[in-house]
């Protein structure tokens, strides 16, 4: 049996843009994608820490070193530039894979630069 597990997340990302008149998706700095092990067109969940909104979309790679986190299309109605979000990727793992899987947690600062890389999310609140 396969179960769904978090594979990686970008924690405390700051929304830089919200573009309502785009087809859809989230644009993320490609350096951040590499750090988190996320890929273009991968399905992700977005959690807005400012208003509690949760949504799903897919990734479009953004310009490297730009720090871009841009919600596009209808998702732009649920975020504002400056909002803090968590971007979570999930994967289907077998029981055996799940026992050895270590998710990547990339903690960002307010400029969307990598502040900390965590091999496994600690059992405490990250401030």
UniProtKB/Swiss-Prot annotation:
Is synthesized initially as an inactive proenzyme, which is activated by self-cleavage at a specific serine bond to produce a beta-subunit with a hydroxyl group at its C-terminus and an alpha-subunit with a pyruvoyl group at its N-terminus. Its cofactor is pyruvate. Substrate binds at residues 57, 73-75. It is found in: Cytoplasm. InterPro entries: Asp_de-COase-like_dom_sf, Asp_decarbox. Pfam families: Asp_decarbox. One of its GO terms (cellular component) is cytosol. The keyword Cell membrane does not apply. Pathway: Cofactor biosynthesis; (R)-pantothenate biosynthesis; beta-alanine from L-aspartate: step 1/1. GO terms for biological process: alanine biosynthetic process; pantothenate biosynthetic process. Binds 1 pyruvoyl group covalently per subunit. Keywords: Autocatalytic cleavage, Cytoplasm, Decarboxylase, Lyase, Pantothenate biosynthesis, Pyruvate, Schiff base, Zymogen. Heterooctamer of four alpha and four beta subunits. This is Aspartate 1-decarboxylase. It comes from Bacillus pumilus (strain SAFR-032). The lineage of its organism: Bacteria, Bacillati, Bacillota, Bacilli, Bacillales.
């Amino acid at each position: 049996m396969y179960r769904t597990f978090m594979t990686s997340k970008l924690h405390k990302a700051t929304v830089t843009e919200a573009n309502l008149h785009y087809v859809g998706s989230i644009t993320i700095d490609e350096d951040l994608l590499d750090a988190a092990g996320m890929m273009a067109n991968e399905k992700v969940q977005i959690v807005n820490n400012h208003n509690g909104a949760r949504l799903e979309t897919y990734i479009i790679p953004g310009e490297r070193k730009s720090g871009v986190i841009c919600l596009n299309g209808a998702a732009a109605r649920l975020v504002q530039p400056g909002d803090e979000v968590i971007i979570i990727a999930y994967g289907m793992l077998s029981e055996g894979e799940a026992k050895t899987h270590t998710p990547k947690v990339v903690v960002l600062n307010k400029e969307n630069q990598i502040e900390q890389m965590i091999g496994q999310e600690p059992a405490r609140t990250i401030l």
